[in-house]
């Protein structure tokens, strides 16, 4: 009984990191998922992780322990946000498409954040999450938080968050996110650009034709046709996004931790 009590502070640190990870991670962090389920899943995963990682020495609950708890929450939030930032490229691609289609005014509520999200972006994002479940990519996300304890132990008080390389890594991750969004939306956006160009030529040659009445349904039809044609390519990009997400999480751990 005494050994269990001595190990409880270290277990609580593991539980804090995993709970913070589940707050921001895609799929598990949705507001539609009950908080009791997330806490329970985080608890059982913390039990599994704690039974396999190297046990730290006995920890006292003092001001140093409060710093460790804050560090664990920060590590979990950073890992979850990096994973969400990579997959959020799908929503950004949808916002590019919505803006060109004329759907930018018709937003829906994002269940992840509660904020407004583009209509096509939310549709593609939901399809990406279902695809993630079908290929078991969510297992890789859980592997990421599990192996984080090998890079950043629970008794390591000060990870290298203040390093210049960390700021460069975050900027590079943002750059990768927008590049992926551009790659996913480029076929549809380019097609809509050609439609706008054709409508401009028609407006100059046939002034009697109201291009504003014809243009909106035409652009919507072309957009859906291009989405159907390019859907397989979009899923290939989404699969690469999953691989990039895991690679980004591991690079972050290698950067701020000690392997």
UniProtKB/Swiss-Prot annotation:
Q: Where are the transmembrane segments?
A: 8-28, 33-53, 73-93, 117-137, 177-197, 218-238
One Pfam match, given by its short name, reads Bac_export_1
Major place of localization? Answer: membrane
* Entry's localization field: Cell membrane; Bacterial flagellum basal body
A cellular component annotation (GO) from this entry: plasma membrane
- InterPro entries in the cross-refs: FliR (IPR006303), T3SS_IM_R (IPR002010)
Q: Which UniProt keywords are listed?
A: Bacterial flagellum, Cell membrane, Membrane, Transmembrane, Transmembrane helix
> Can you cite a GO biological process for this protein?
bacterial-type flagellum-dependent swarming motility
Bilayer topology term:
Multi-pass membrane protein
Family statement: Belongs to the FliR/MopE/SpaR family.
What NCBIfam families would the database entry show?
A: fliR
Q: What does this protein do?
A: Role in flagellar biosynthesis.
| Protein name, as recorded | Flagellar biosynthetic protein FliR
High-level lineage: Bacteria, Bacillati, Bacillota, Bacilli, Bacillales
């Amino acid at each position: 009984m005494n050994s269990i009590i001595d190990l409880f502070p270290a277990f609580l640190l593991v539980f804090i990191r995993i709970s913070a990870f589940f707050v921001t991670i895609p799929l598990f962090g949705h507001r539609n998922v009950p908080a009791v389920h997330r806490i329970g899943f985080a608890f059982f995963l913390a039990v599994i992780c704690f039974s396999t990682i190297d046990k730290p020495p006995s920890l006292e609950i003092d001001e140093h322990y409060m710093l460790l708890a804050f560090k664990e929450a920060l590590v979990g939030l950073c890992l979850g946000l990096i994973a969400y930032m990579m997959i959020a490229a799908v929503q950004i691609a949808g916002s590019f498409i919505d803006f060109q289609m004329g759907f930018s005014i018709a937003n829906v509520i994002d269940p992840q954040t509660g904020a407004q999200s583009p209509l096509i972006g939310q549709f593609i994002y939901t399809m990406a999450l279902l695809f993630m479940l079908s290929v078991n990519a969510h297992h890789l996300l859980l592997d990421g938080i599990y192996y984080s304890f090998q890079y950043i132990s629970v008794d390591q008080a000060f990870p290298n968050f203040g390093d210049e390389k960390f700021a460069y890594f975050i900027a590079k991750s943002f750059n990768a996110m927008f590049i992926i969004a551009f790659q996913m939306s480029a076929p549809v956006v380019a097609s809509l650009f050609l439609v706008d160009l054709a409508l401009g030529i028609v407006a100059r040659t046939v002034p009697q034709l109201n291009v504003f009445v014809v243009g909106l349904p035409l652009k919507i039809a072309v957009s859906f046709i291009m989405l159907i044609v390019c859907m397989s390519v979009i899923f290939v990009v989404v699969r690469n996004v999953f691989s990039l997400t895991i690679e980004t999480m591991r690079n972050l751990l290698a950067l701020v931790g000690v392997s």
